[in-house]
A protein has these predicted regions:
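Mg2+-dependent prenyl diphosphate-binding active-site environment of isoprenoid biosynthetic enzymes
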Residues: 2-208
Length: 208
């Protein structure tokens, strides 16, 4: 992988700033269940890859057409549109490879459940589906339920995953994992509200 020309734009998309709030939530939730941080590292890395992929694609001219991300030039502005598409797609697939690796302190059953969950929440029923709704709603009147549904998918689903995945590692039962997932969704919606407020009131250079 180090020989790939895509490594540099991939690193740029992941490491270049950002609050890393999703990883923080994973670690903090894990602490509540006395889970050693090393058991959560691969999940955090995967989440940051998924989140960064979604931002890279979200900024593309065919999507939201944003030139600034995290106070710096968006990936497509720095490396070109085609490279940004490939870097984002590579981060998406890298996330699943990270979870499937040996010696990441997860059992095979946990890996399978986490991979299935992440695929569900990052694809057409999650992040990608939410982005499609966002594009379809552009310049159209939409009611509050449509907006919430879009935000649940586009932003909330990855927060759902963060808490649910910790529940998997903690060997919680189905009901407990669903409760964690529901809490994650609420956190995601609150985060999106705060983010939207910053987009309107904050400095574009600082907020990105």
């Amino acid at each position: 992988q180090k020989k790939s020309l895509l490594v540099t734009p991939m690193k740029y998309g992941v490491i270049s700033g950002g609050k890393k709030i999703r990883s923080t939530i994973i670690f903090d939730t894990g602490r509540l269940f006395n889970i050693k941080y090393k058991k959560l590292l691969s999940i955090c890395a995967a989440v940051e890859c998924i989140h960064s992929y979604s931002l890279i694609h979200d900024d593309l001219p065919c999507m939201d057409n944003d030139s600034i991300r995290r106070g710096k030039p968006a990936t497509h502005k720095k490396f070109g549109e085609a490279t940004a598409v490939l870097a984002g797609s590579s981060l998406l697939t890298l996330a699943f490879e990270i979870i499937s690796r040996e010696n990441n302190y997860l059992t095979l059953k946990q890996k399978n459940e986490i991979i299935s969950l992440l695929a569900n929440f990052s694809g057409h029923t999650g992040i990608a589906g939410g982005q499609e709704l966002d594009l379809k709603f552009e310049n159209k009147n939409k009611n509050i339920n449509q907006i919430i549904d879009m935000q649940r998918k586009k932003t909330g689903k990855l927060f759902n995953f963060c808490l649910h995945a910790v529940g998997i590692v903690a060997n919680k039962n189905k009901k407990e994992k669903k409760l964690l997932e529901s809490l994650g969704e609420d956190i995601g919606l609150l985060f999106q509200l705060a983010d939207d407020f910053l987009d309107r009131k904050g400095s574009k250079k600082l907020v990105g």
